[in-house]
Amino acid sequence: MSYNVRVAIIGGTGLYSLEGMELIEEIFPDTPWGKPSDKIKIGKYKGKLIAFLPRHGIGHFLSPPEVPNHANICALKQLGVEEIVAFSSVGSLREEIKPLDFVLPSQIIDRTRFRNSTYFGNGVVAHAPFAEPFSPNLSKRIAQTAKKIGLEIHLDKTLVCMEGPLFSTKAESHLYRSWGADIINMTVLPEAKLAREAEIAYQMICMSTDYDCWREGEESVTVEMVIANLTKNAETAKKLLSELIHVLGNGDDLSLKNSTRYSIITAPEKRNPETVKKLRVLFPEYF
């Protein structure tokens, strides 16, 4: 791929395109992990070259466990992406996080069960640090932009990622609250883990659509409820992104550069050649 796109936007439920983007090209590349969720749009947005990828595909035909995260992140890495801003709907586990509120999580609890969450294994072992799953630098820029446009946004919250595609039971919802989780979704993992291994700064912007099912007297979450509130939030998300784009992709967060090089532990002579061949697409300088 001949583009040098530094910024990627991953759209979640209800965000399948980016209004105002001047399209240059659509690509649907092959990667060693298959094809991405859908065609990646490359274009200018507010004068900046970006890539846009709908996580669930246009028309929402991929459930959370089916999203080809490995291919998605690999394809964006090949474009030159250094920063990813991902959007997602979430359920609120806290009274103060109301439906339609925006949230910037800083921590994740992994409750997925059947998802491969690494590019490594099968003869090449690596252990990437993940204590801070999101980019503090990127999060700070998003928070500052939200303040600039007068958008109240909840900061430093804990996001629990469940397997899905079914929503939580009441017992699970109360359990997550007791653990200190503030919001819940089905898509931050393994997306965030793979972005970390690929040395891409990553932050998810969460939009609360419901109170999950823990709140007494409140209707339990439904798809209709999620979509209705996402539609209401669309204009706010566009307003935030139209300002945020100016502080993205300017080389402000290169803290992950070369980090994976020092996470690989397998001796060169013991590495599986087939795995090395795949990893070379992501890390040509390491293999």
Curated annotation (Swiss-Prot):
Known EC number:
2.4.2.28
Q: Name one Pfam family in it.
A: PNP_UDP_1
Q: Which reaction does it catalyse?
A: S-methyl-5'-thioadenosine + phosphate = 5-(methylsulfanyl)-alpha-D-ribose 1-phosphate + adenine
Keywords of the record, alphabetical order, are: Glycosyltransferase, Purine salvage, Transferase
The protein's enzyme class:
transferase
Q: What GO molecular-function term can you cite, just one? A: S-methyl-5-thioadenosine phosphorylase activity
A single GO BP term for this record reads:
purine ribonucleoside salvage
Q: Name one GO cellular component term.
A: cytosol
Q: Which residues bind phosphate?
A: 13, 55-56, 187
> Which positions in this protein are listed as binding substrate?
186, 210-212
Instruction: Give me the segments passing through the membrane.
Output: none
Pathway entry: Amino-acid biosynthesis; L-methionine biosynthesis via salvage pathway; S-methyl-5-thio-alpha-D-ribose 1-phosphate from S-methyl-5'-thioadenosine (phosphorylase route): step 1/1
Per the UniProt record, the site (Important for substrate specificity) maps to 168, 223
In UniProt terms, what function does this protein have?
Answer: Catalyzes the reversible phosphorylation of S-methyl-5'-thioadenosine (MTA) to adenine and 5-methylthioribose-1-phosphate. Involved in the breakdown of MTA, a major by-product of polyamine biosynthesis. Responsible for the first step in the methionine salvage pathway after MTA has been generated from S-adenosylmethionine. Has broad substrate specificity with 6-aminopurine nucleosides as preferred substrates.
Quaternary assembly: Homohexamer. Dimer of a homotrimer.
PANTHER family per the UniProt record, alphabetical:
S-METHYL-5'-THIOADENOSINE PHOSPHORYLASE
HAMAP family named in the record: MTAP
Family indicated by similarity: Belongs to the PNP/MTAP phosphorylase family. MTAP subfamily.
**Name of this chain's protein:** S-methyl-5'-thioadenosine phosphorylase
- Give the species this sequence originates from: Leptospira interrogans serogroup Icterohaemorrhagiae serovar copenhageni (strain Fiocruz L1-130)
